[in-house]
Amino acid sequence: VNPLYLLKSLYNCFLTCNGQSLHDAEVFDITHDEGVFDVSSRKGQFQAPCLVLAAGLGNRKLAPLIGLKQPVRPQKGQILVTQKIDKLIDVPMTLLRQTAEGSIMIGDSKEEVGFDISSSIDIMAQIADRARRTLPVLEKQQIIRSWAALRVMSPDGFPMYDQSEVCPGGFAITCHSGVTLAAAHCFDMAADIEAGNFSVGLQSFSERRFDVSAN
């Protein structure tokens, strides 16, 4: 799955369904009164009977405003991208992924460095060396770009799906596998949110699993 094509398709579908997208609309506060959420943002006030927090690392700050916890942390990963080449990879791999256009995306690094998103030569060199040893033909291919980004990590690495008891209609969703889980989120989870309650299967991913005293 090409994540860029997937994101574009989901975004277009969102707009087709009369969704409204606001950029640079940082949220400052959320209140809940008589079944209605009031969200204060850089782009103004918004009210709705249902609220889904899917702000990635921002959920750590926002979730407590609706009575939930989202103990997420940033984990940096770096990626190298090769020139376009003929089809080489036809099996799933964690280190190497080939796009439909032919470029190979290389990388599975994990760095606990807070919110630092700078690229580092030593990590990129390690990634390139592992790729060369995994698939020797890559040694002669050019790297055309690279970048670093932050994963949204829970304490155990698995998703966190929660619904608020003190603010009914409020949900918090966190994962670092958005592309892999897109189908489940679009169909199963969306239906549960519309119904106002997570199914038993999703409830097992609640943040409460980290509360030893509650278990």
Feature roles, as predicted:
Residues 3, 135-215:
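C-terminal catalytic lobe of FAD-dependent flavoproteins
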Residues 32-33, 75, 99, 164:
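A short, compositionally biased micro-patch
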Residues 41, 45-88, 120:
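Central helical "cap/lid" subdomain
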Residues 32, 62-64, 91, 115-117, ...:
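Short glycine-/acidic-enriched loop or helix-start segments at secondary-structure transitions
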Residues 1-50, 58:
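Helical element adjacent to the flavin cofactor pocket in flavoenzyme catalytic cores
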Residues 1-13, 56-58, 123-130, 175, ...:
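Mid-domain beta-loop-alpha active-site segment that forms a flexible
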Residues 85-168:
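Active-site lid/adjacent beta-loop-alpha segment flanking the redox-cofactor pocket in flavoenzymes
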